[in-house]
Amino acid sequence: MTMKSIWISAVALCGWLMAGQAWADCTPPALSGEADFSLCKNWPAYPQLTITALSTFVPDPVYDQDGRVGSYDLALAVTTAGSPKPLATYHQRSAFLSDAIALESLELDTARYKLTPDLRAFGVRAHFKGSSRVNPLDETLLSLYVKEGDKLRSVLDRLVVYSFSGEWDGNCAGERSETVRTLEMGKTSSHGYADIIVRSVTTGLVGEGPPDTCESKTTHEKPVLTTLRYDGETYILPQGFKGM
């Protein structure tokens, strides 16, 4: 091995170690309650930036009997590695409602949401789960945020990207339906932001008869493509696409 190749390898190793150290600094915000959610994730599109999220449960003063009915505030921040002061922040009171359909988990989404050549959004996925077995209702909602100066701004509000619902007897008879939505950035744009192509795939399940002789049939609907366009403030969602 030549001295030049040794030097290049050493530089590459040093850079890898420094990057690894920066990424290792990701620390979720401190929790204040058992029902709260806290998480952090490094942002691959911007290697020196980290996203943090803290969702704090606020019990309903009238209807909360078991610590499950209420709302969740949401606080987001983008920080640089090793710096305690955030570069940009966002706070929303009562961002999510939680009752019979309870907030089960949060997830930071750093997929390639490229809205302009120089601007990428990140996402927050909120997973909800219903308490009824015979009337299931599970949903995942996706919201997108962009950094503008020292603020974070929502540009997509609670798009339903997964839903599972139905009505059955818990053994066989009844109907259930699952819809999965995926996003792709379009080649066209509206008000400066790329249009978003949403692909919806719905699968149905119908059961008939008693448990021991249950007959079930699965149906697959043709995928449906829907274009979301930015109106200068937010992406407009068609009826039925926005969650609670």
Give residue spans per PLM region:
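Acidic, small-residue rich beta-repeat scaffolds with periodic aromatic anchors
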Residues: 24-33, 39-45, 139, 147-153, ...
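Solvent-exposed N-terminal domain segments of exported/luminal and surface proteins
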Residues: 25-72
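Acidic/hydrophobic-patterned starts of short beta strands in beta-sheet-rich repeat architectures
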Residues: 47-57, 114-128, 190-201
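Short N-terminal edge-element motif at the start of the domain
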Residues: 62-116
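Bacterial N-terminal signal peptides that target proteins for export
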Residues: 1-11
